[in-house]
């Protein structure tokens, strides 16, 4: 055995990594061709994609945007691409876009819709992005009343009286909560606010309207339709169902028998009944239980029951988040001397909501898509109601895929945005160190 050692005095130039171990080729080997089954599925998927593109591409590329009827669309396609060619008649979207978006809302009042939608984004901004000043939350709280007045019109003093009732509720709750506790003070505030709305609001509204008449032209609910209707129902149900679902989830875990029984009953009943049944109840049966002569708006009835339906599912999602928390979190709250509501607000519920983000957003996406079911109770949703109205016009009779594709793209835009925001929120709130 030799004692002579060898020491290299110069560095070798680094060699590039094998082509099969880096870049796109490596990714394809690991994800698309990692085995016989994956290879077969990849080849089948490629063949199906090629067939679909070959079938759909001519129809999409031959589409016509400038026409006044389906007959004119077909004539233009035949002139450009031959008598046997087919193509999409996108002109129906160009001509009827306002009905798909706004239903039968008066055209001269579209400015109210634009102001409402711009206000919606401004109201959601401080809720979705905590970098903004917290004082902007006051604008978020005032937005629902302003949006109601802008959309439906009428005297401004109606929303003002509703705001006054909530102000009374908030003042009483703030004053009584330290002495009587959260449940009792909230109950007293609700009773006083309800008495104000029942007996004092109407005379005050009439007096203010006679002294200072401020009103917008009224718009009936049967003129709502399209994505305006979907957003009114969907956004309202999403915003209200989350706090209501939190209360139902906490009620289901309560030690008080009445509260727990009511919460379990509401959750199980609503989850066990199809949404379409609740919509028919809102449309037909609910009117029989109201006093004679009561005019309870159909959209409001639908919003209430859709909100209850969503809240029941949100409650179960949040209950799963609560169950995932270790017992030590509750013990830590007790060790700090926090009462029940302080513990829920500061320690328990923030962690449960963070765990439940994927399930909550999935419920919201499903809820927004389910707004199309209101077509079965006579409302003009964008998918079925407005599409049928457009096709009932002889100029566009025969169009089929174009309205559905347009509506699907807009639904995808909203739902994809919600999905991406939930992923952003999960990354932002991630606190583990894996």
UniProtKB/Swiss-Prot annotation:
Span of domain ABC transmembrane type-1: 227-422
GO cellular component terms attached to this protein's record: ATP-binding cassette (ABC) transporter complex
CDD domains: TM_PBP2 (cd06261)
TM stretches of this protein: 41-61, 113-133, 135-155, 156-176, 180-200, 227-247, 272-292, 298-318, 360-380, 398-418
Membrane topology: Multi-pass membrane protein
A GO molecular-function descriptor: transmembrane transporter activity
Cellular localization per UniProt: Cell inner membrane
GO biological process: amino acid transport
UniProt-listed InterPro entries: AA_ABC_transptr_permease_3TM (IPR010065), ArtM/GltK/GlnP/TcyL/YhdX-like (IPR043429), MetI-like (IPR000515), MetI-like_sf (IPR035906)
Main location: membrane
Top-rank taxon: Bacteria
Keyword Transmembrane helix belongs to the record: yes
Keywords from the UniProt entry: Amino-acid transport, Cell inner membrane, Cell membrane, Membrane, Transmembrane, Transmembrane helix, Transport
Function: Part of a binding-protein-dependent transport system for glutamate, glutamine, aspartate and asparagine. Probably responsible for the translocation of the substrate across the membrane.
Quaternary organization: BztB and BztC form a heterodimer which can form a membrane complex with a homodimer of BztD.
Family, similarity comment: Belongs to the binding-protein-dependent transport system permease family. HisMQ subfamily.
Protein's name in the database: Glutamate/glutamine/aspartate/asparagine transport system permease protein BztC
Organism field: Rhodobacter capsulatus (strain ATCC BAA-309 / NBRC 16581 / SB1003)
Gene assigned in the entry: bztC
